[in-house]
Amino acid sequence: MSTITSYFGFLLAASTITPALLIGLSKIRLI
């Protein structure tokens, strides 16, 4: 049960961090 919870937590973190990184990279490229 703990492994499933940590797995979904990892997916949630990845789904929130990845777009933020992409936006940051796009802003850096625009500058």
Curated annotation (Swiss-Prot):
**Chief location category:** plastid
In terms of InterPro entries, this protein maps to: Cyt_b6/f_cplx_su6
Annotated GO biological processes are: photosynthesis
Q: How does it sit in the membrane?
A: Single-pass membrane protein
Superkingdom as given in the UniProt entry = Eukaryota
Segments crossing the lipid bilayer: 4-26
- Which Pfam families did the record assign? PetL
Is Thylakoid set as a keyword in this record?
A: yes
Q: Where in the cell is it found?
A: Plastid, Chloroplast thylakoid membrane
One Gene Ontology term, aspect cellular component: chloroplast thylakoid membrane
Similarity annotation = Belongs to the PetL family.
Record note on quaternary structure: The 4 large subunits of the cytochrome b6-f complex are cytochrome b6, subunit IV (17 kDa polypeptide, PetD), cytochrome f and the Rieske protein, while the 4 small subunits are PetG, PetL, PetM and PetN. The complex functions as a dimer.
The role this protein plays is: Component of the cytochrome b6-f complex, which mediates electron transfer between photosystem II (PSII) and photosystem I (PSI), cyclic electron flow around PSI, and state transitions. PetL is important for photoautotrophic growth as well as for electron transfer efficiency and stability of the cytochrome b6-f complex.
Q: What is the official name of this protein in its record?
A: Cytochrome b6-f complex subunit 6
The record lists the organism as Liriodendron tulipifera
The primary gene name is petL
